[in-house]
Amino acid sequence: MKKKYLSLLLLCLSLVGCKTKAVVELDYLPIADPYVMLYEGKYYAYGTGGTVEGEGFACFSSDDLKSWRRESQALSATDSYGTWGFWAPEVYYVESKKKFYLFYSAEEHICVATADTPQGPFRQAVKQPIWDEKSIDTSLFIDDDGTPYLYFVRFTDGNVIWAAQMNDDLTSIKPETLTECIKVEEPWELSQDKPAKVAEGPSILKKDGVYYLVYSANHFESKNYGVGYATSDSPMGPWKKYAGNPILQRTDGLLGTGHGAPFRCKDGSWKYIFHAHWDTTKVQPRTSYIKGFAISDHGVASIDGSIIKPQVLGTASKNNE
């Protein structure tokens, strides 16, 4: 009995001399189609892949955009529609609802789930898509007058970006408002290394009464996958593509750069998170990077500046010296 207590005492004393420290678990952020939300001074990232708990979406958090920590699983397949193909999540805090909304794709259908915290767990009260037609890549925009719009991809002529007004419940659209926004038309949007009519990954911003639709084009496996934008005086278009597109393509030695989203930073500036190919010879796994995003006084959007390569931290214990 005394030996048992002595062993326990020695174990406790050894633990007192230990402490945890942050260590680099991954030297990259393991998500594609990434999205970042700033909430109460902390950044939260979501994307395709990166989960360690089965189908669904992971959540990562950061104070500085460089070092990230894995949070709990944000959404699990058991709590939502679909069993495969969980892609392109975007999370919004809707003040009028006091809820977080996660818009995403599953089984090539667009869905939405809700939670009380940015980490989740996000769940669907009724496990069903927003509408029956196959679609992907949702992005929510709520205008100054409170009208909600949903932008997403339909397979009408390749991948084509459409918009529709949402009902106030934010779980369904008004089909009669469906409007085509962006399709492949420009030479840069149809790269010959992997020709495919793909316009996808929409994001919407508004500045000085002008609406900006940021999108990606080309097949995601193409080395020339890139980002462009179009402008309009209305959230439903018509949209005029910027003559200087693409504004992001083959940057900083990276290939396949695109399908990201602009987000506001703590200091009020903007940045753009996007994914790229693993390296110059392999597409998968795609990983995420961050660059600056701005709209000039002349209304020109740009993605530039120094690049941030995020890393994921874990913890390890060490003995005090």
Predicted features, each with a name:
Residues 1-4:
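Positively charged n-region of N-terminal signal peptides that target proteins for export
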Residues 10-17:
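Hydrophobic h-region of N-terminal signal peptides that target proteins for export
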Residues 18-321:
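Carbohydrate-active catalytic/glycan-binding domains of CAZyme proteins
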